[in-house]
Amino acid sequence: MRQLSRRAALAVGAGAVTLSVVGWSQGAHAAAKEAADEVAKFTGGKAATQGKITIELPEIAENGNTVPLTVSVDAPMTAENYVSDVLVVSEGNPNPGVVTFHFTPLSGKAEAQTRIRLAATQNIVVVAKTSKGEFYTALKQVKVTIGGCGG
C-alpha cells in the first residue's frame, strides 16, 4: 500500500474542502433563487419598493428551532387603502415560504408576531401587498448557530 506524502495529503484535503464549499454555495444560490421565485409569484412579477416594513429578529439566533419574528408595516389601514397580505420568505431554508399574514382594515395595524424555524444563517425577506396593488419589501440577515430545519 502506497503512503501519501504530506504535500499530497494536504492537496487532497484542500480539494475536499473546496468541493464541499462549492456544493454548499450552489445549494445556497438555489435556495435564494427559490425564495426569489416565491416573492415573484406573490407580487405577480411587479417591483417592490424598499421601506415601510420593520422586521424584528435577533441578530444572532442561538437555536434555529424557534426564532422570534415581529413584522410591522407603516401604512394606512383604511377601507380604501390597507395592507392586505404580508409574505415572509427565508433564503436558506429547504422550503422558502415561511408564513403569509392576511389583514383587513379592521385589523387596525399591519403587525404580526410568530416564531420561525431557520436552517442556517440567512436573509429573511418580507414583502407587503396593499389593497391598491402596491408592494413594499425589506430584508434582514439572521446568524443561526444551531440550525432548526435539519441543519
Predicted features by range, described:
Residues 131-137:
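Short acidic/polar inter-strand loop motif in beta-rich domains
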